[in-house]
Amino acid sequence: MRIISGSHKGRRLRVPKNLPVRPTTDRSKEALFNILQNQYEWSEIKTLDLFSGTGNISYEFASRGVSSVTAVDQNRFCTAFISKSSKELELEIQVIQSDVFKFTKDCSLEFDLIFADPPYDIGEEKYFELIELIFKTIILNSTGSLIIEHSGKLKFEKHPNWRNSRNYGSNTFSFFER
């Protein structure tokens, strides 16, 4: 896994094989950030990485100078890896070990951009539950965006906050706005 751009461009991280994750591929991540870099002034936004796994997306945000990066994952080995790696890289990432649904319900912070990469096998209803929860709480600010990474089998076009989807191999990113 490598950081694509920013202050840590080209840095590679070795991910332990025992982590229960499916990191976003470099190709997909690069395509996603090419879209986002034209929409955001990194130093002015707060980001939230839900189901953060290895922290792949969080490292990329932090390397690009995002003002606040928060990573949430339920797995203690994942959060320990993100904490250790971000410390080694000297990247400021707030790491929270929590069930994502509980965190989203209870969180009193607002974010400009939320990225979520749930396990593909959690089921379609859980994806919709997460989207609804994010848009019903204060966690996403009034001009904020949500990006969900998912398999191409899921379709969100009928959701009122859906704006578009982009496919990259077996990965799809769906974009939602308030």
Residue ranges and their predicted role:
Residues 1-178:
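Class I S-adenosyl-L-methionine-dependent methyltransferase catalytic core
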